[in-house]
């Protein structure tokens, strides 16, 4: 408390607790609220027991109020999941309580490619869509109806979430959605992603730590857990990487992620990598 008082916390509009320890972040926010109730608090929380169910109630009770809880792992998991659910998309941002989305997609083979934006109304007449921006050769364009979408453009559009796939199909031609997914790394992010996907997709996880494999096998119901090195090309071949629709490199080792993605890209240039 003395440190916070010396820092004149009562004059601060927003305080962010970002240490590596959840409990320290929580107590820091508690102390800040005790000294200055008007100061908004934001805390990084990683442990799953604090993020759902009764565990999350602590953030709503008394002096333990945290105005904004940030879970990096959840944010990354949600980001990847949104891309998986929208084949062809590079980025997906939901807003309006999940009713609308802004999506970026690379123009390739769709009906609107090579045509004016105004022609979208003729191709998908019952869909309300707005092309917000075009990234062309690293130059940002704020377009109007007379602008043309060229092959290779990164197109940012806004539409109702239910219409996203219809719009993407006019910009990017893809054969099918994802069905078979391989995840390299069964850490916090890998496990959460598998848990969110295994009810709809066939999921395989490659994890180097044997004890972690046992843990994953206990926590996940429909995912196949494999013990091994995800950067091992022989292992990837043995596990039929050529049958995977998407490969997600999510280990804690950046070099291993780069190596495994590079291998899958060279072997399977038409498949997806994250």
Regions found by a protein language model. Name each.
Residues 1-274:
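Cytosolic regulatory regions of ion transport systems
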């Amino acid at each position: 408390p003395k440190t916070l008082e010396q820092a004149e916390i009562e004059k601060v509009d927003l305080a962010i607790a970002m240490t590596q320890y959840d409990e320290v972040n929580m107590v820091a926010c508690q102390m800040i609220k005790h000294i200055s109730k008007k100061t908004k608090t934001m805390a990084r929380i990683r442990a799953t027991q604090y993020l759902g169910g009764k565990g999350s109630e602590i953030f709503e009770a008394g002096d333990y109020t945290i105005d904004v809880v940030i879970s990096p792992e959840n944010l990354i998991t949600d980001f990847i999941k949104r891309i998986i659910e929208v084949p062809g998309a590079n980025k997906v941002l939901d807003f309006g309580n999940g009713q609308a989305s802004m999506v970026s997609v690379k123009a390739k083979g769709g009906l609107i490619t090579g045509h004016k934006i105004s022609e979208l109304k003729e191709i998908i007449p019952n869909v309300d869509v707005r092309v917000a921006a075009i990234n062309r050769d690293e130059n940002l364009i704020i377009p109007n109806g007379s602008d043309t979408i060229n092959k290779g453009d990164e197109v940012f559009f806004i539409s109702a979430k239910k219409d996203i796939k219809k719009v993407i199909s006019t910009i990017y031609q893809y054969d099918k959605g994802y069905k078979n997914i391989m995840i390299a790394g069964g850490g916090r992010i890998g496990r959460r992603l598998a848990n969110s996907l295994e009810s709809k997709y066939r999921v395989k996880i490659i994890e180097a730590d044997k004890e972690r494999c046992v843990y994953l096998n206990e926590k996940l119901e429909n995912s196949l857990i494999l013990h091994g090195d995800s950067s091992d090309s022989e292992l990837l071949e043995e596990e039929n990487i050529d049958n995977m629709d998407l490969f997600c490199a999510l280990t804690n080792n950046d070099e291993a992620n780069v190596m495994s993605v590079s291998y899958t890209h060279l072997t399977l240039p038409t498949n997806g990598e994250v």
